[in-house]
């Protein structure tokens, strides 16, 4: 994904907008015509709630210093490939409801960890507000078909190359639709360019349109996916130093930025100018998020914090 956690993604999006700079997450499969076709079929033929099965799994034998399984390098199947099944589940449920995506309202996960407490494989059940359910899985020590199945009980979509979209089969792939009578319809997908070339073309077009975000991978989609990935990791207790504000090697909000000013006032007995705007400290998801928000508030000129936690 774009970053290790949702707080870092939030900070990048803020910088992108402040500096009028294009920021796009490199999810190649979302650009491909196959994915567009899947979402069109969902909108035309399926009704919520959906039942989704999505996997991205492979098996490799690598030392624990390898980036796939190294805690210090953000290793683990969830961040390496789990971001794919969780994103297509969100998109499919969104498409069934006439939206780009919907975020799950609950995530229950489990998995297998290595000696560094990094996930070698992970599975999760996602539940959505429309009662859709997605079962997803990622693994770097187990192989599977790595396919996607989406159904509403009447019509079913089967995707056997959801992530590479025919990249390794002469740029040709196929979708299968099965109705409740068992009748099958096959839809062939082919492109004259590779999946990564299509991704580069889309980025270039977005850049030349002077947009700061992609219409296919907007910022709120990337941020929502990262929040879901954070929750999935928390279920397995997979935690990186970058998730803990007190353990980060560098702050998310740079202290080299020129500090701004806010209107201030004086209170008798206190020798400091106090910002009239006070930061309420509740609703922080973790120390990482809290430190980033507090630093941002300080760099904007704030210096008064309300630390009460009961309202």
Model-derived segments and spans:
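Beta-strand-loop-alpha-helix segment that lines the small-molecule cofactor/substrate pocket
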Residues: 1-27, 301
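Short glycine-enriched loops at secondary-structure junctions
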Residues: 2-3, 55-60, 283-285
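Alpha-helical elements of Rossmann-like donor-binding domains used by nucleotide-donor carbohydrate transfer enzymes
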Residues: 11, 33, 37-41, 51, ...
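Predominantly a Rossmann-like dinucleotide-binding segment in NAD(P)-dependent oxidoreductases
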Residues: 29-108, 114
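NAD(P)-dinucleotide binding in Rossmann-like oxidoreductases
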Residues: 113-119, 129-207, 211-220
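C-terminal helix-rich "cap/oligomerization" subdomain common to oxidoreductases
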Residues: 129, 204-261
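N-terminal binding-site loop/beta-alpha segment at the start of enzyme catalytic domains
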Residues: 247-311
């Amino acid at each position: 994904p774009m970053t290790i956690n949702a707080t870092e993604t939030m900070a990048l999006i803020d910088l992108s907008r402040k500096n009028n700079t294009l920021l796009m997450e490199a999810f190649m499969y979302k650009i491909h015509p196959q994915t567009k076709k899947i979402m069109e079929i969902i909108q035309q033929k399926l009704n919520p709630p959906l039942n989704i099965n999505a996997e991205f799994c492979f098996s490799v034998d690598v030392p624990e210093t390898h980036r796939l399984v190294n805690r210090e390098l953000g290793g683990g199947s969830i961040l390496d490939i789990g971001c794919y099944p969780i994103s297509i589940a969100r998109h499919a449920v969104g498409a069934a409801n006439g939206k780009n995506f919907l975020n799950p309202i609950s995530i229950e996960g489990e998995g297998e960890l290595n000696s560094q407490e990094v996930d070698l494989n992970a599975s999760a059940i996602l539940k959505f507000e429309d009662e859709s359910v997605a079962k997803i899985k990622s693994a770097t020590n187990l192989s599977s078909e790595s396919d996607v199945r989406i159904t509403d009980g009447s019509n079913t979509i089967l995707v056997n190359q959801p992530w590479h979209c025919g990249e390794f089969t002469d740029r040709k792939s196929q979708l299968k639709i099965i109705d409740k009578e068992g009748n099958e319809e096959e839809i062939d997908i082919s492109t004259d360019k590779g999946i990564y070339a299509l991704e580069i073309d889309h980025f270039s077009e977005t850049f030349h349109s002077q947009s700061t975000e992609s219409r296919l991978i907007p910022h709120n989609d990337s941020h929502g996916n990262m929040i879901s990935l954070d929750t999935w990791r928390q279920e397995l207790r997979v935690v990186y130093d970058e998730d803990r504000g007190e353990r980060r090697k560098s702050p998310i909000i740079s202290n080299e930025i020129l500090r701004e000013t806010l209107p201030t006032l004086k209170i008798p007995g206190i020798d400091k100018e106090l910002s009239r705007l006070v930061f309420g400290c509740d609703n922080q998801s973790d120390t990482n998020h809290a430190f980033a928000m507090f630093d941002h508030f300080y760099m904007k000129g704030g210096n008064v914090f309300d630390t009460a936690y009961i309202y």
